[in-house]
Regions:
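Charged, compositionally biased N-terminal leader segments and the immediate start
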Residues: 1-47
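Interdomain "pre-motor" coupling segment immediately N-terminal to P-loop NTPase/helicase cores
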Residues: 37, 41-96
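N-terminal pre-Walker A segment at the start of P-loop NTPase domains
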Residues: 99-120
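Conserved hydrophobic/aromatic pocket- or pore-lining residues that grip, position, or stack substrates
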Residues: 104, 145, 163
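Phosphate-binding P-loop
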Residues: 120-128
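Walker A/P-loop nucleotide-binding motif
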Residues: 128-144
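Active-site signature of alpha/beta-hydrolase-fold catalytic machinery across serine-
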Residues: 147, 151
């Protein structure tokens, strides 16, 4: 994330923010000269270009120091680029439902509060450690994993999100066209790889191989989150034992294992009438 310094002289009058502080509205701010617009376009500074008319009008009215004008304009460009990068990475990650920590109900989860807080720091991602979340359906496993994934993107890292079925399909397509190594490399460019809902459907040889390939390639290099209704030690009941043993060995070597309990939160919402918008 970009950190913006705020040092200034006592005589510098500065805005509270860099985007909505102008005493001159954007409708009356003068347009930039065509020559300057062309230069900014050539320099690929679209966010600075968009912000410049209002910023310059405000700077003129409030008599900003020139260095402050430059700082604000550059900050707008950085902010715009960071926002665009996050949008691009969210789209590329393939996150399922837009569930973040804003909608996460910490007190409804059986994950200990201290564990939730510790995982939300993302320090474990920096250490290339893994996370296995296991428990009954509807106990918040996917929501918590997706909230972590969004936060990873927010702090400037990348995410690859799969179900075991979609991962198997991706590796299967790569096997057909001979691009398995390239596909694995693309997946493991992400600092966090999430494989969701392992165990919901039977997994055969192809699924076991795909899972193993990714875990092996990421081992001690990237963080993996898996969610499952099974503890990872039981993965040999849904996929070939040899592959499951080798995969789980690598997965759990540097892993936090979190167990969820209780009844389905989705079912509780449904029975309480909170799963839909009232019709009247």
């Amino acid at each position: 994330m970009t950190t913006t310094t705020t040092a200034t002289t006592a005589t510098t009058r500065r805005p509270r923010t860099t985007s909505t502080t102008s005493t001159t509205s954007t409708s009356t701010a003068p347009d930039l000269p065509d020559e300057l617009l062309a230069v900014l376009k050539r320099m690929r500074l679209p966010y600075l270009r968009d912000a410049a008319p209002e910023v310059l009008a405000t700077a003129r009215a409030q008599r900003w120091d020139p260095a402050e004008v430059l700082r604000v304009l550059i900050t707008e460009e950085i902010r715009g680029r960071d926002d665009a990068t996050r949008r691009m990475r969210r789209k590329a990650a393939g996150l399922p439902a837009g569930k973040t920590f804003e909608s996460w109900r910490e007190h409804d989860s059986t994950i200990p509060p201290g564990t939730q807080t510790g995982l939300a720091t993302l320090e474990w991602v920096g250490r290339a450690e893994n996370l296995a979340i296991a428990g009954p359906s509807g106990t918040g496993k996917t929501h918590f994993a997706e909230a972590l994934a969004h936060k990873v993107i927010d702090v400037g890292m990348r995410v690859s999100w799969f179900t075991l079925e979609s991962l198997t399909a991706a590796i299967g397509r790569a096997t057909v066209d001979g691009s398995v190594a390239k596909t694995i490399a693309r997946i493991t460019r992400a600092e966090l790889i999430v494989i969701d809902d392992i165990g919901m459907l039977p997994a055969g040889q192809a699924a076991g191989e795909a899972f193993y390939r990714v875990v092996d390639a990421a081992y001690e290099r990237r963080s993996i989150v898996v969610t499952s209704n099974l503890h990872p030690s039981g993965f040999d009941t849904i996929m070939p034992k040899t592959l499951a043993t080798a995969t789980v060995d690598r997965l759990l070597h540097h892993a936090h294992v979190v167990l969820t309990e209780g009844t389905s939160l989705r079912l509780s919402e449904a029975t309480a009438g909170r799963g839909v918008v009232p019709l009247a």
